[in-house]
Regions:
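Short acidic active-site motifs
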Residues: 9-10, 58-62, 94
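Conserved helix-turn-beta segment immediately C-terminal to the redox Cys motif
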Residues: 17-19, 34-54
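Structural micro-motif
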Residues: 60, 66-75
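Structural signal for short hydrophobic segments within the conserved structured cores
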Residues: 4, 50-52, 81-86
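Conserved redox-active cysteine motifs that mediate thiol-disulfide chemistry
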Residues: 24-38
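Short active-site neighborhood of thiol/selenol oxidoreductases, capturing the structured segment around
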Residues: 15-27
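Non-catalytic, surface beta->alpha helical segment in thiol-disulfide oxidoreductase systems
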Residues: 76-102
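N-terminal "domain-start" segment that seeds a small globular fold
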Residues: 1-13, 50
Length: 102
């Protein structure tokens, strides 16, 4: 499963109301690069979840919409609503536990 590059123009059509894990990051963010392979691995294991990446420098309105103020921020959405928020780099197990609680 691939990770969708999200923007204002495609966010609602790709994510919609499906369960989703959205990774907010930036090219300059070291910890964002650290969690990227973890998110990619989880995406391959969970095809039932929509995975997305938002570069906050390119999509500041989406960052504002979800009140993202620090990086990396990972949001877990269900029915279009944030059900879990992770600030900073987390372990694979942390993300998996949250997905399994959906």
């Amino acid at each position: 499963m691939s990770i969708n590059i999200l923007s204002e123009s495609n966010f609602d059509s790709i994510v919609g109301t499906k369960p989703a894990l959205i990774d907010f990051g930036a090219e300059w963010c070291v910890y964002c690069k650290k969690i990227a392979p973890i998110i990619e691995e989880i995406a391959g294991e969970h095809p039932e979840i929509t995975f997305g990446y938002i570069d906050v420098d390119l999509q500041p309105m989406l960052a504002a919409r979800f009140r993202v103020h620090s990086l990396p921020t990972v949001l877990l959405l269900k029915d279009g609503q944030v059900v879990k928020q992770f600030l900073g780099a987390q372990s694979k197990e942390t993300y998996l536990n949250a997905i399994n609680e959906l």
